[in-house]
Structures are given as structure tokens and as C-alpha cells.
A protein has these predicted regions:
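Canonical BTB/POZ domain core
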Residues: 41-53, 59-128, 143, 206-245, ...
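Classical protein tyrosine phosphatase
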Residues: 129-133
Length: 299
């Protein structure tokens, strides 16, 4: 009997490729609409990954320092093609940045702010080139909106994982981690005060039944190395090591599903990369385990 797994993988790959081509086609169609609305023929084609955008040099060079340099330093006086192979966030992020250059309104939110900030950095969209440029706009949203709530900070941090190293360069990762640690420790402090009256027994001064805090679920979407950095930041702010037990348990339950099938008897076949990732998760969690008794008593 034929193994259905390769067929499923091939089908999934085909569907992903089809969806990708459809998204790129939609992006190029939208840019064509921008050109038509300007009633001026495009004079530059910008290639970002597999997507091509037919645009105008003037709105781009007026706000994008990186593109201005490429145009000015080119030996071709009528440079008609610009390559941006390393734009963070790819075609989706560049499309939004281009819309900003054209003065087209779009909504900024926690789901796109990370790639917008990183794309703006890559394109050098600073105040040096235009007042109220994209770097300043995104920074204002990050500081005044995104990092004001734990959900916002976690969402931005989650999106930043695919935008390294630029997200590290603009300190987006470190700022999100600090904001999460601050909120989590603040919440833990007040919740522990509220629980004090319900705790009848202590083991060497420690609560005998740790409770999973409301924010712990949000952290399970983070990559293990980023998750570890969050916990280290929390402990540096005074979060008690023994309180990590329930948080680690929750993360392990989410990220190590099927572990017994992989490493136990009758091992299930798994790709080397996936096996390595699960090993790293397991080893990291073990290294973070609290040493106090009853740290995992969730009953």
C-alpha cells in the first residue's frame, strides 16, 4: 500500500504555491490600480522576492533613502529596475511601505506593525528624507499602542521572530520582551496578594499550589529561544523561580505534543530538523525547571 504522506506533502506544497502566486498576482494588480489612478506612466519596476511592482521613482526616492541611493549611485541614468531581495516582510511589507509613499491610507495594527517597522528601517524611511516618515510613524504606534498591553507586545514579538536580524537591530524584540516581563510581573504580584487568603499551607514559605496566570497561554506561541528570554527577563524583574513551573508545563504541553511517539518505543518517523527542534525545546525547558517542591502541583 502506498504511503499517503508524500502525496499529502506534495498536495500541501502545491496549494501553498498556488496561494502564494495568487497573493503576488493580487499585489501586482493593486499596484497597477495605483498607477492608473496617477495617470502617469510608471518609470521603475521594483522586484521584491518573486513579486514585481511597477511604480514611480519620485514618490519612492522622496521617502526611501535606500532606493534614493540605489538610483543616484547607478551608472544607468535611466535606471528602470530596482532589486530589493532582502526587504523584511517581503512583498507584503514593501507594498504597504509603497502605499505610504503614495499617500494611500491603510490600517496599522499589531499584526503588521513589526514588518512595517523593519521594512521602514531597511528602506531608510527616516525624518532625514521626509517629515513624518514611516520609521517615526511606526515607532509612535509601537510605543503608544502596541507595547501598552501584554497581548499587543506578545503579538508584535511573535511577528518579529520571522524578521530577524532587523527586528533585533531596531530593538523591537528586546522592547517587547521588557514590556511582557513588566506586565506579567505586575500581574503576578497583585494576583499573589489576592491568592494569599486562599492558601492554607506553605512549604518553606512557598505556596503549595501554583496557579497558571492568565498571560501564560499567550506565551506559548513564541519560539523556544524567545520564550526563554522572556522568562529570564521576568526573573530579573523579581518573578519567583518556583512560579515558572505551571508556565513551563503549559508551554511543554503545547510544543511537545506527540513526544512519546517520537522518542518512545516504536518511534514514529520524523524529519531530522523537527527532531532537533523538539530536543532543543525539551532541553531548554529542563534547564528552566524550578527546583522547589510542588512547583508542578496544578490540582
Amino acid at each position: 500500500m502506498a504511503d499517503p504522506e508524500p502525496e499529502k506533502a506534495q498536495l500541501s506544497s502545491s496549494l501553498n504555491m498556488s496561494a502564494k502566486k495568487e497573493l503576488l498576482s493580487t499585489a501586482m494588480k493593486r499596484t497597477s490600480e495605483w498607477i492608473f489612478s496617477q495617470e502617469i506612466p510608471s518609470d521603475v519596476t521594483v522586484h521584491v522576492g518573486e513579486a514585481s511592482f511597477s511604480l514611480h521613482k519620485f514618490p519612492l526616492v522622496s521617502k526611501c533613502g535606500h532606493i534614493r541611493k540605489l538610483v543616484s549611485e547607478s551608472t544607468d541614468a535611466d535606471l528602470a529596475t530596482v532589486e530589493l531581495p532582502n526587504c523584511p516582510g517581503g512583498a507584503e511589507a514593501f507594498e504597504l511601505a509603497a502605499m505610504f509613499c503614495y499617500g494611500i491610507n491603510f490600517e496599522i495594527g499589531t499584526e503588521n506593525i513589526a514588518m512595517l517597522r523593519c521594512a521602514a528601517e531597511y528602506l531608510e524611511m527616516t525624518e532625514e528624507y521626509a517629515v513624518g516618515n514611516l520609521v517615526g510613524r511606526t515607532e509612535a504606534y509601537i510605543n503608544e499602542v502596541a507595547l501598552k498591553s501584554l497581548a499587543g507586545a506578545v503579538s508584535v514579538l511573535h511577528m518579529s521572530q520571522s524578521l530577524l536580524p532587523t527586528a533585533e537591530k531596531v530593538k523591537l524584540v528586546s522592547r517587547c520582551i521588557d514590556a511582557i516581563a513588566f506586565v506579567a510581573c505586575k500581574d503576578s504580584h497583585f494576583s499573589m496578594l489576592g491568592r494569599a487568603s486562599d492558601i492554607g499551607h506553605h512549604n518553606k514559605g512557598l505556596p503549595s499550589k501554583p496557579i497558571v496566570d492568565w498571560w501564560a497561554e499567550d506565551l506559548t506561541v513564541l519560539r523556544i529561544d524567545i520564550f526563554q528570554r522572556v522568562l529570564v527577563a521576568m526573573m530579573s524583574r523579581g518573578y519567583k523561580h518556583y512560579s515558572l513551573g505551571p508556565v513551563l508545563m503549559l508551554y511543554a504541553q503545547k510544543s511537545l505534543r506527540g513526544l512519546q511517539e517520537v522518542f518512545g518505543k516504536g518511534r514514529k518517523k520524523i524529519e531530522p530538523q523537527q527532531e532537533h527542534e523538539k530536543r532543543v525545546v525539551l532541553e531548554t525547558i529542563v534547564s528552566l525547571l524550578p527546583r522547589e517542591k510542588n512547583a508542578f502541583d496544578l490540582s
